[in-house]
Regions:
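N-proximal low-complexity "stem/linker" segments adjacent to membrane-targeting elements
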Residues: 1-28
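Short, acidic, metal-binding catalytic loop of nucleotide-sugar glycosyltransferases
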Residues: 27-38
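A conserved acidic beta->alpha catalytic loop
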Residues: 44-53, 92-96
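Glycine-rich, basic loop-to-helix element that forms the pyrophosphate-binding segment
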Residues: 66-83, 105
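Short aromatic/hydrophobic "clamp" motif used to bind/position activated sugar donors
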Residues: 88
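Conserved donor NDP-sugar-binding/catalytic core segment of glycosyltransferases
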Residues: 101-158
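A short, conserved alpha-helix in the catalytic core of glycosyltransferases
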Residues: 187-188, 192-195, 199-203, 208-233
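Non-catalytic, C-terminal membrane-associated alpha-helical segments of glycosyltransferases
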Residues: 251-255, 269-338
Length: 338
């Protein structure tokens, strides 16, 4: 690939007290084999009080204080509006790029196909040296096991090598081109992805107050912008949370972003109007309560990759069942007593 045909990029990172992971994230960005004059470094910060902003400054990022503090989704919407370039590399502060070719690999689908909307990695990176929960997420390809069982993950489990969701229209040695509809669109838009700014601004409900990183791409799919790429590489997601912290974080996330009446969802991981989704949700509850299916899935994964982190799966299923249940009860109470 010649540098003269490489597109300009805006690297967008949203932050809130991310000093623990940020330096590792930014070092990997700085090491990319990509012309520096083609890269804008943009940060939208939600009110950090640790060393986050100083670290960003050292690495050459332009930091903007969010007008909607403490809301990562709104920060993404603000960054979308402020970006100078059309291709946005969206990274969280706990995402680490595994090689210096990552930018080049991720933009290739956009160079090859002018209708391309979004590109994400095939896997999360698995590293035996990582924490057990990070390894679990990388092994199963999801943070949320409900997504795994309903069948809408945006990454594959480590033992899965072929992408089958949606309508596969082209496969190369480097990536898969897929057309999605609203029934097959996975949970895209976050943790190491590249997407087009122009389409989101013109055709999606991308105002910061309403921005949700999956829903804006559902807006595009609904309007006929259906071409997505699954790039055959990976990205590290360093969640590094304890299991109690995970439960607390997930309840807050669901209550804040996904169960509020003020946010009209255009994308539903579980659509209560669809019988198939209802059945899959009931099966997830049954699987979690009985433990049998999660243990079988753990054993299958362990057969391919000998990492005991697979067997965290039954525990994570219980945590998420509790988190969704607690958030749903909280929403019901608000309806009844507000």
């Amino acid at each position: 690939m010649k540098s003269m045909i490489l597109p300009r990029l805006t690297v967008l990172i949203v932050t809130l007290n991310n000093a623990r992971t940020l330096q590792t994230c930014l070092k990997a960005i700085a090491a990319q084999d990509y012309p520096k004059n083609l890269i804008e470094l943009l940060n939208v910060d939600g009110g950090s009080t640790d060393e986050t902003l100083n670290i960003l400054k050292r690495f050459g990022f332009r930091s903007v204080h969010s007008t909607i503090p403490g809301n990562a989704e709104a920060q993404r919407g603000i960054g979308l509006k402020l970006a100078k370039n059309n291709l946005i590399v969206s990274l969280d502060a706990d995402n680490y790029l595994p090689t210096d070719q990552w930018f080049r690999e991720m933009v290739q689908p956009f160079i090859d196909d002018p209708t391309m909307v979004h590109a994400n990695t095939l896997h999360y990176r698995h590293d035996y040296r990582d924490t057990v929960y990070n390894r679990y997420c990388a092994l199963f390809g999801v943070v949320d096991p409900i997504v795994f069982y309903i069948g809408r993950p945006d990454r594959l489990a480590q033992y899965q090598k072929s992408w089958t969701l949606g309508n596969v229209v082209k496969e190369t040695s480097a990536y898969v081109s897929v057309d999605f509809d609203l029934g097959t669109l996975p949970t895209v838009g976050c943790n190491g992805v590249v997407y087009r700014r122009d389409l989101l601004l013109k055709h999606a409900n991308s105002a910061p107050e309403q921005f949700l990183h999956i829903d804006v791409f559902a807006d595009l799919v609904a309007k006929g912008f259906t071409r997505f790429a699954i790039v055959k590489n990976d990205v590290t997601h360093d969640t590094a949370v304890s299991l109690p912290a995970l439960m607390k974080k997930r309840i807050a996330f669901l209550s804040g972003y996904y169960l509020k009446n003020t946010l009209k969802r255009r994308y539903l991981i579980h659509n209560p109007q669809k019988i198939t989704d209802q059945i899959k949700l009931l099966l997830f509850i049954l699987y979690t309560v009985t433990l049998i299916k999660p243990l079988i899935d753990s054993a299958v994964g362990f057969y391919y990759i000998r990492d005991p982190a697979w067997f965290l799966h039954p525990v994570i299923c219980w945590i998420y069942l509790y988190a969704y249940g607690a958030a749903s009860i909280k929403k019901l109470k608000l309806r009844l007593f507000s």
